[in-house]
């Protein structure tokens, strides 16, 4: 299973990639919307773990763009935002 982690917090990105790789998944990592788009244009992913807030854009907009090209790709959103 091929995964893409899109998270601008380097510690969280590295932790997710390490644990997912240790669980046997093939994992790529991006820290910006632009990098994620490049990865998605180059290959297919079974699952994308996507931060809601990225330094160069919005995770929801990125999800829409990904789903236009590959509607079957599963997406899990992450955020450090609270409800307050």
Segments predicted by a language model, with ranges:
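N-terminal/domain-start alpha-helical segments
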Residues: 1-84
């Amino acid at each position: 299973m091929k995964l893409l982690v899109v998270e601008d917090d380097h510690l969280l990105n590295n932790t997710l990639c390490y644990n997912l790789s240790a669980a046997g998944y093939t994992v790529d990592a991006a820290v910006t919307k632009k990098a994620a788009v490049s990865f998605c244009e180059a290959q297919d992913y079974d699952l994308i773990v996507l931060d809601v807030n990225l330094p160069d854009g919005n995770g929801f907009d990125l999800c829409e763009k990904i789903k236009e090209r590959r509607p079957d790709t599963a997406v899990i959103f992450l955020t450090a935002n609270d409800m307050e």
